[in-house]
Regions:
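Glycine-rich phosphate/diphosphate-binding loop of Rossmann-like nucleotide-binding domains
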Residues: 1-56
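Short, glycine/charged-enriched secondary-structure capping and boundary segments
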Residues: 3, 25-27, 48, 65-68, ...
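Structural beta-strand/beta-sheet cores of well-ordered domains, especially the beta-sheet scaffolds
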Residues: 6-8, 29, 46-49, 62-64, ...
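Hydrophobic/aromatic beta-strand patches that form the interior of the parallel beta-sheet core
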Residues: 11, 34, 79-81, 112
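Electropositive phosphate-/nucleotide-binding environments in soluble metabolic enzymes
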Residues: 13, 17, 38, 42, ...
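ADP-ribose/adenylate-binding Rossmann-like module
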Residues: 51-110
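Adenosine-phosphate binding glycine-rich loop
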Residues: 85, 90-179
């Protein structure tokens, strides 16, 4: 949304056609939606000034979809911003950085890969998190945890521990060294 507001040409990639249609409708054609596959990603890398990585695959290691070769094809001094670096990288040249040393150059491309980027904006992030969580808190308060889990699949998918047990497959697998 911010890039569109600044007049940038924005390309959004996804494998879910329904999600792409929804985005296209929501932004009234002001962005370009494309199916995420190697050919499209290679093509866009050659002219992108800013590449934003934001892939999260719950329960799985994030696949590398932007190879070092694709990064090499980018114009020098382009920028990679990786929003979900704390979930392993979808860009081969990415590695976590810190708020005190947030950027590095690799293949002539400036990388910004700070985990928990919202930590810089603590108050704003807190308000956003409160707003996102409030409907779940109200549901649990109204019907109790067990009934809320039964009636709300997204709440159930977000549950990591329950009654002293690890119930989320991704957390369990990562703690057991399978991820």
């Amino acid at each position: 949304r911010n890039f569109i507001g600044m007049g940038a040409a924005v390309y959004v990639f996804d494998q879910n056609l329904s999600r792409l249609r929804t985005l296209d409708h929501h932004f009234q054609g002001k962005l370009v939606t494309m199916v995420s596959h190697e050919f499209n990603l290679e093509k866009v890398c050659t002219f992108a000034d800013v590449l934003v990585g934001a892939i999260l695959v719950p329960g799985q290691r994030t696949p590398v979809v932007i190879s070092r070769e694709m990064v090499k094809s980018m114009r020098k001094r382009s920028i990679i911003i990786y929003l979900s670096i704390d979930h392993v990288g979808c860009i081969e040249t990415s590695r976590p950085t810190t708020h005190s040393n947030p950027t590095y150059l690799e293949e002539g491309i400036l990388h910004y890969c700070v985990p928990n980027m919202t930590g810089v904006l603590g108050r704003t992030a807190t308000h956003a998190m409160n707003n996102a969580c409030w409907p779940y808190v109200r549901l649990i308060a109204a019907v109790g945890l067990e009934k809320a889990l039964e009636t709300n699949p997204s709440l159930e998918r977000g549950l990591y521990t329950h009654q002293g047990e690890i119930v989320h497959p991704y957390l369990r697998d990562s703690l057991e060294g399978r991820i």
